[in-house]
Amino acid sequence: MKVTKFYNLKAEKHLIIQILVEKDFFLQIYTKIDTQVFYFQSHQILYRSINILHTKKVLINLPNLLSLLHSELVSETVINYLITLFNDRDNFRILNINDSLKVLLDNFIRRELQNSCAKIVSLTFNFNLSVETLLQKSNLLISNINTYNKKVSLKSISQLLLETILEIDKKTNRSTHVLTGFFDLDHILVGLQKSDLIIIAGRPSMGKTAFMLSLVRNVADIQSFPIVIFSLEMSSKQLIYRLISNETNIATSRLREGNISISEWEILNRAMTILSNLNIYLDDENNLDVLDIQSKLASLQQIYGDIGLIVIDYLQLLQYKEKSSQRHIELSYITRYLKLIAKDFNLPLVVLSQLSRNVEFRLNKRPILSDLKESGCLSYATNQPYFLKSDNVNFSKLTSLKVSNHYILSATLELLIPFQYNRIYPIVSLIKRELQTGYKVVYELDFYISVIVSTVEHYVLTLNGWKRILELTVDDLVATLDIQYLIYNNTEVDLFSSNVIFSSVINLICMNRINVYDFWIPKTNNFFVNALLVHNSIEQDADVVLFLYRDSYYQHNLKQSNIDMCEVIVAKHRHGTIGMVNLIFNPNTVSFMNLIKES
């Protein structure tokens, strides 16, 4: 079979020329175009050298690029080629740079697909692999390429303004969110937003599945798009019994026993007609992982069109076939992937989650975010996060907690292989909120180039993924900043490239009990402190976090009745306010209703 080489010489030349002649053009593409996107080696060398100029905060132009090429002893052939290319720049003026970028990326993706298909064919002959593993590895190869398909999106402000106005116009005529049917909750959330990851958490038997089914039933009644429930705990038949019980107000136990009167059969028949017309789909396959869910959704979308809402019951039962020695690392990967699924399919994705036992050991048993994330916290007196004040670009120590809307040094992590962060790029991120998380025992962690003081629950990035400080050993290597590289030119901050190194752990010492703090960094969910890269919580992948709490669950001496009150606590809401609403819980039918019915 003839092998076709996918490349476009003119497009590659055009991009190099554009970088050299147009000020700030490189800033628009350097995080989106990698060296390997270029097919010709000479262009790869030139683009890599341009990257170095940018990293060193040197103006990108022909003289500086030539100087760098000479200093790095690049061959005269490449240097002469660059001079010839630059002198020929006028011939590229009539070309559209966006077209050239599209052609460049199109050819790169075709090359990568060609290579991936060859790898997949090779994998099919490895009979030591199960079919499930083969499909997973194949999906991973293709999904990695798909990330490049979304990288380049240069748009003028006029184009963006037009798109925004059209979007606003659509919103005036059609709702772009999903109403839950719980009026007070919708008042806070303004419905469930597309591309959001929503976590509904509570202790066992608090009513998570019941709340989910009531929500799904409401949504299906309000809007007609397909709703998909992935139930990893209960069978489809169990869920159907619940739905029938909710619809007929007949207890599930009586339905299972067949203890139905003649008049109730009429109610049951009407309920069957109503439920049959709802656009709800159930999948009760167990041992699902996130790639299975992504694959199933893609198939469902081809059959039924756009999907309106996805529900997963529940998070802790989701699998990841490439096993990690620590479950919390798997869950961190899973939640991040679920968020990507919500964005890719442009729909709200609801995930039910268990809560830790920490709730049971407090007098006030209402859940808080730390019960979900179980993350650690930092001492501000002894640590130095790399802060950037909003009115200048100087580094500063953290001397108070009033740092909202200031900037901090964090990192983007490219997860090309699960649990292995292949590329780490320091970037500047906005601090959305600071949190005082308590008065706790802290430990001093000594490593090769610095020291950090933290609770042992806080996560740091190692070569094997995120680990709690308590779980670190002397064999672990943790992600740290190359400080000498960082302070280049004293105060410049936008010179970062891949200047993250891994340092060995030396010692862990218990210190004393002090006030500790955490930060909300919305996009990267991590930040550098004393040169160490730390995670600022697992739950940050979620856009909305809801907790369910019923007093009667703990107050067993309360008189039993046919109705019960349940608090739905909006503990996190990325798009708006937080708060609490009350709903009625019916233990007889295991369902939720609005506290005050619409007149």
UniProtKB/Swiss-Prot annotation:
Q: Which Pfam families match?
A: DnaB, DnaB_C
Q: How does it assemble?
A: Homohexamer.
The family classification in the record reads:
Belongs to the helicase family. DnaB subfamily.
Q: What does this protein do?
A: A replicative DNA helicase, it participates in initiation and elongation during chromosome replication. Travels ahead of the DNA replisome, separating dsDNA into templates for DNA synthesis. A processive ATP-dependent 5'-3' DNA helicase it has DNA-dependent ATPase activity.
The main location is plastid
* Superkingdom assignment: Eukaryota
Give the SF4 helicase domain ranges.
Answer: 171-439, 333-599
Task: List where in the cell it is found.
Answer: Plastid, Chloroplast
| Residues binding ATP, per UniProt | G202, R203, P204, S205, M206, G207, K208, T209
Keyword match Hydrolase: yes
Q: Which residues form a coiled coil?
A: none
Catalytic activities:
Couples ATP hydrolysis with the unwinding of duplex DNA at the replication fork by translocating in the 5'-3' direction. This creates two antiparallel DNA single strands (ssDNA). The leading ssDNA polymer is the template for DNA polymerase III holoenzyme which synthesizes a continuous strand; ATP + H2O = ADP + phosphate + H(+)
Q: Can you supply one Gene Ontology CC term for this chain's record?
A: chloroplast
Its name, as the record gives it, is Probable replicative DNA helicase
Gene Ontology biological-process entries: DNA replication, synthesis of primer
Which is one GO molecular function term here?
Answer: ATP binding
Protein EC:
5.6.2.3, 3.1.-.-
Classification via SMART domains? HintC
Alphabetical UniProt keywords = ATP-binding, Autocatalytic cleavage, Chloroplast, DNA replication, DNA-binding, Helicase, Hydrolase, Isomerase, Nucleotide-binding, Plastid, Primosome, Protein splicing, Repeat
User: Top-down, what is the taxonomic lineage of the species of origin?
Assistant: Eukaryota, Cryptophyceae, Pyrenomonadales, Geminigeraceae, Guillardia
What the entry lists under InterPro entries is as follows:
DNA_heli_DnaB-like_N_sf, DNA_helicase_DnaB, DNA_helicase_DnaB-like_C, DNA_helicase_DnaB-like_N, DNA_helicase_N/primase_C, Hint_dom_C, Hint_dom_sf, Intein_C
Q: How is it modified after translation?
A: This protein undergoes a protein self splicing that involves a post-translational excision of the intervening region (intein) followed by peptide ligation.
